[in-house]
Amino acid sequence: STAVVTDGQMEPAFDLDAELHFQPTTWPGARLPHTWIFRESNGDKVSTLDLCGHGQFTLFTGIGGEAWREAATQVGADFGMAINVHVIGPRQEYVDHVGDWARANEVSDTGCILVRPDHHVAWRADELSEDPKSELARVMNTILAR
């Protein structure tokens, strides 16, 4: 499917029967794993799944991925759509106190994960690209078949 752009890595091997068990991964094409994170402002527990969907693409990044936020804003404007962005890390809107997101996301703090409105991972980057806006625009062009 062109609605998924792989990152060049092989699909992870399943430890258990994939037909019977869910194995959390952010490999493109997989459903975004659920992890609990916490809203920095009030400590409320929030699922990563509740932060995406709602008819929009969502981009998750870490404390070193601020350039992805800027790229998503610019690319979203170019495409005439909003791309929601959530930075998860210390002193950000959402924090990962127990480390569940850090264990599940499979990218560095400068990388990102782009999630489709149906909660499936469309693409991920392990680290910050030299030109995040161009990279994200290329990915969105592929996903949206433009």
Language-model-detected regions and their locations in the chain:
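Helical substrate-recognition/capping region of FAD-dependent monooxygenase/halogenase enzymes
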Residues: S1-R146
